[in-house]
């Protein structure tokens, strides 16, 4: 009984650490604007869709694998490259400030700070194993090792969820950062729970209950994250709910590293892109 009471207490503390919202799946995207919407394209959702069609398919035969092996994807160095992969000659790819992976105009730490193979080469850092030994498929796209991990773990999660989705038994929900345009339009960028969102979206869930972490709780969480960023490990409220109207106060704008116009181009990309434009540009089958 004592164990049960402790579990309930932990759950209550967790639920009080932010704001619960029931969010339409159509408004949820990942940290690189690969949407979970029905008309979008997300590489983890494609993984699950392909496995659902053929459970005997080999990893190397999947669009998921071929996507990360594509020469255009393997050449990604910056966030700008990845968001605007389909527009190689565009202004964002060639002019202005380049954001390392893991960084955004409004701040670093919602995505864990700067990381990546190219970042390590330029800055003399070591970020490959920030989230576990070779766990990050975007650290050096094309590395088979993290893709095998993602493949196996996502399939296990798929089977678990198809037996019943009871997130609070696990003690946590998907967590998101909200982007809010001046007109009130929103996008929810996943903070935690990307694989779960991929499975739920494929299974037809129209809405999902998610937690928007409070500034204090997300800062406490980040205190345990490994990072090589020189920024303080504190996430301010504007970085949990990122508002277009506050662009002049975003970290990289305020520090003079990028212009408000460039910052907003990246911000609006999360509303205007959904991933399908990039998989189409690469000439790969979307699967779903």
Question: In which residue ranges do the predicted regions lie?
Answer:
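Membrane-proximal basic amphipathic "stem/tether" segments
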Residues: 1-55, 235-241, 249, 254, ...
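N-terminal accessory/pre-domain segments preceding catalytic cores
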Residues: 29-103
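Active-site or metal-binding loop neighborhoods of secreted/extracellular toxin and effector enzymes
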Residues: 210-285
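Extended, charge-rich helix/loop segments that form flexible
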Residues: 69-138, 142-144
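Short glycine-/polar-rich loops that comprise or flank the Walker A/P-loop
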Residues: 206
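A sequence-level detector for short glycine-anchored, His/Arg-bearing signature motifs
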Residues: 181-203, 288
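Ordered hydrophobic segments in well-structured contexts
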Residues: 175-180, 198-199, 209-211
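Short alpha-helix boundary/capping and kink motifs at helix termini
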Residues: 9-16, 44, 48-55, 65-67, ...
């Amino acid at each position: 009984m004592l164990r049960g009471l402790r579990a309930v207490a932990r759950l209550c503390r967790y639920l009080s650490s932010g704001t619960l919202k029931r969010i339409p799946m159509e408004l949820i995207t990942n940290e690189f604007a690969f949407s979970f919407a029905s008309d979008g394209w997300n590489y983890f959702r494609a993984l699950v869709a392909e496995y659902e069609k053929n459970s005997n398919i080999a990893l190397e035969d999947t669009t998921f694998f071929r996507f990360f092996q594509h020469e255009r994807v393997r050449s990604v160095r910056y966030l700008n490259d990845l968001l605007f992969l389909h527009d190689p000659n565009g202004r964002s790819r060639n002019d202005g400030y380049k954001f390392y992976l893991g960084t955004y105009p409004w701040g670093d730490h919602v995505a864990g700070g700067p990381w990546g193979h190219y970042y390590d080469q330029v800055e003399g850092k070591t970020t490959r194993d920030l989230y576990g030994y070779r766990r990050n498929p975007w650290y050096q796209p094309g590395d088979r090792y993290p893709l095998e991990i993602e493949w196996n773990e996502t399939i296990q999660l798929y089977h678990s969820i198809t037996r019943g989705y009871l997130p609070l038994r696990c003690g946590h929900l998907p967590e998101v950062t909200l982007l809010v345009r001046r007109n009130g339009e929103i996008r929810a960028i996943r903070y935690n729970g990307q694989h779960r969102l991929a499975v739920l979206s494929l299974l037809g869930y129209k809405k999902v209950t998610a937690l928007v972490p409070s500034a204090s709780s997300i800062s406490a969480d980040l205190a345990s994250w490994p990072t090589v960023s020189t920024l303080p490990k504190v996430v301010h409220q504007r970085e949990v709910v990122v508002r277009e109207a506050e662009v002049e106060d975003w970290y990289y704008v305020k520090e003079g590293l990028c212009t408000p116009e460039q910052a907003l181009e990246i911000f609006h990309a999360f509303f205007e892109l959904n991933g399908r434009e990039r998989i189409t540009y690469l000439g790969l089958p979307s699967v779903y």
